[in-house]
Amino acid sequence: MELFSFSILYACLCLSLFYQPARTQQAYINGSTLWNCSGNPATSKGYLCDASVKSCEAFVTFRSRAPHDTAISIAYLLGSEASKIASINKVSASDKIPSNKLIVVPVSCSCSGNIFQHYSPYTVIKNDTYFKTANDTYQGLTTCQAMIGQNYYDPENIPVGAVLTVPVRCACPSENQTADGITSR
């Protein structure tokens, strides 16, 4: 019995030598954050910067939907380059992309404060709200909390024609991730 207890203890000790805690890079936003613009959780602002990496070329994904259904219109909305979008996705810059097709969009991602973001200007149209712009127009690539934090317009009264700064969520791989072969391209 003593030998059995010692064997169990020895096995546990050996296994503990191989223990490596998982280190997650980011927290993900949950449904209540997406549907509630009045909260201000830190995770709704974007992904935290790694102290050693300040910027990178990254990408986001976007589903083509009218009026954002050409490489040109998607580039204009997301502050990217139509020629790069067209090349990556093997489409023409000006041809209509089939509705709901997932498009890879290259963006310049940089650390602003302690959050990775890509900034894109957006001109407000009638009936726009931060919530509608974040969730419908930008398809969740930003949050209404991040937009409210970045712009000075009253959330209940954004004037038509106002140009908003949209902080698009992006992230760059850490040095450890890059060493492991992960790239942002």
Predicted regions and their residues:
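N-terminal V-set
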Residues: 28-37, 87-91, 96-99
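Short acidic beta-strand-loop surface patches of small beta-rich interaction domains
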Residues: 86-94, 148-155
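Soluble extramembrane regions of membrane proteins in the secretory/endomembrane system
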Residues: 167-169
